[in-house]
């Protein structure tokens, strides 16, 4: 079911005059000077409404709001509303009754601003109608709309102006100063497994091995340039029985041999 159309009010003017106009003998436009402007046929209120795409010019009584005449407008500018050639305050409209009969009458406004608002209200409505028709066509045929072409034409060039950029402090690529140490000289420990070179004593110094002073041996062939230090002897391995201390401390108990003499008694 189609959505019901509602009637909206576009313009209301409280003072409008209606005139009888003589029939137009030629194709030239209407002239307000040919009307009896000092003797209007009717005076009242004008109201412009819209229902769907059709606008309606309604002439109503100022007090009761009773409808005097109505002019449906389906196109503007068009034959339903025409401007006169000698004034901007007067128009010719085509009124219709419920039986399909039509007649042309003249209307006029006392204020030029009211005539301007009347004209603009009709223009805005039909501008909206035109946009709605275009949107409906685009919705039905979306591929037929104009496509935006952003490609370069043959021989077309562009020019880019790039301003010089200043390097900021601490930017990438700028070496930073290493912070100075406030303490003494700090050395990293040697890596695990590294061999440390033995330090040779200076002249006049003696090497102490096992509590005794050892003099370095000088090689006669080298002219005293090479010093050969004796290597410390490995500790002698005790040849005594490892259980000797335990057997000595037992004293007389060792004379009493228990069964299984191969075991040491604690």
Swiss-Prot record:
<feature type="short sequence motif" description="WXXF motif 2">
    <location>
        <begin position="263"/>
        <end position="266"/>
    </location>
</feature>
<dbReference type="GO" id="GO:0005886">
    <property type="term" value="C:plasma membrane"/>
</dbReference>
<protein>
    <recommendedName>
        <fullName>Adaptin ear-binding coat-associated protein 2</fullName>
    </recommendedName>
</protein>
<dbReference type="InterPro" id="IPR011993">
    <property type="entry name" value="PH-like_dom_sf"/>
</dbReference>
<keyword id="KW-0813">Transport</keyword>
<keyword id="KW-0597">Phosphoprotein</keyword>
<keyword id="KW-0653">Protein transport</keyword>
<keyword id="KW-0472">Membrane</keyword>
<keyword id="KW-0677">Repeat</keyword>
<feature type="compositionally biased region" description="Low complexity">
    <location>
        <begin position="247"/>
        <end position="258"/>
    </location>
</feature>
<feature type="region of interest" description="Disordered">
    <location>
        <begin position="244"/>
        <end position="266"/>
    </location>
</feature>
<comment type="function">
    <text>Involved in endocytosis.</text>
</comment>
<keyword id="KW-0254">Endocytosis</keyword>
<dbReference type="Pfam" id="PF07933">
    <property type="entry name" value="DUF1681"/>
</dbReference>
<dbReference type="InterPro" id="IPR012466">
    <property type="entry name" value="NECAP_PHear"/>
</dbReference>
<feature type="short sequence motif" description="WXXF motif 1">
    <location>
        <begin position="243"/>
        <end position="246"/>
    </location>
</feature>
<feature type="modified residue" description="Phosphoserine">
    <location>
        <position position="181"/>
    </location>
</feature>
<dbReference type="GO" id="GO:0015031">
    <property type="term" value="P:protein transport"/>
</dbReference>
<dbReference type="GO" id="GO:0016192">
    <property type="term" value="P:vesicle-mediated transport"/>
</dbReference>
<keyword id="KW-1003">Cell membrane</keyword>
<comment type="subunit">
    <text>Interacts with AP1G1 and AP2A1 components of the adapter protein complexes AP-1 and AP-2. Interacts with the GAE domain proteins GGA1, GGA2 and GGA3.</text>
</comment>
<dbReference type="GO" id="GO:0006897">
    <property type="term" value="P:endocytosis"/>
</dbReference>
<dbReference type="GO" id="GO:0030125">
    <property type="term" value="C:clathrin vesicle coat"/>
</dbReference>
<comment type="similarity">
    <text>Belongs to the NECAP family.</text>
</comment>
<feature type="region of interest" description="Disordered">
    <location>
        <begin position="164"/>
        <end position="191"/>
    </location>
</feature>
<keyword id="KW-0968">Cytoplasmic vesicle</keyword>
């Amino acid at each position: 079911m189609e959505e019901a159309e509602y009637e909206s009010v576009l313009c209301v003017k409280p003072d409008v005059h209606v005139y009888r106009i003589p029939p137009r003998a030629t194709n030239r436009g209407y002239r307000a000077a040919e009307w009896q402007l000092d003797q209007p046929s009717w005076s009242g209120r004008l109201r412009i409404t819209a229902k769907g795409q059709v606008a309606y010019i309604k002439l109503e009584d100022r007090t009761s709001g009773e409808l005097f005449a109505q002019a449906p407008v389906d196109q503007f500018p068009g034959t339903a509303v025409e401007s006169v050639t000698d004034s901007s305050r007067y128009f010719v409209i085509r009124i219709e009754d419920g039986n399909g009969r039509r007649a042309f009458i003249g209307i006029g406004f006392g204020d030029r601003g009211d005539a301007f608002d009347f004209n603009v209200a009709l223009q805005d409505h039909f501008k909206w109608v035109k946009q709605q028709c275009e949107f409906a066509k685009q919705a039905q045929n979306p591929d037929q709309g104009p496509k935006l072409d952003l490609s370069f034409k043959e021989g077309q060039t562009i020019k880019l102006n790039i301003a010089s950029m200043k390097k900021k402090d601490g930017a990438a690529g700028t070496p930073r100063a290493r912070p100075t140490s406030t303490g003494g000289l700090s050395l990293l420990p040697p890596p695990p497994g590294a061999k440390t070179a033995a330090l040779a004593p200076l002249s006049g110094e003696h090497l102490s091995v096992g509590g005794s002073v050892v003099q370095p041996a000088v090689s006669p062939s080298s002219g005293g340039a090479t010093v050969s230090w004796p290597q410390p002897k490995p500790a002698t391995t005790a040849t005594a029985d490892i259980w000797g201390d335990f057997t000595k401390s037992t004293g007389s108990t060792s004379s009493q041999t228990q069964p299984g003499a191969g075991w040491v008694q604690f």
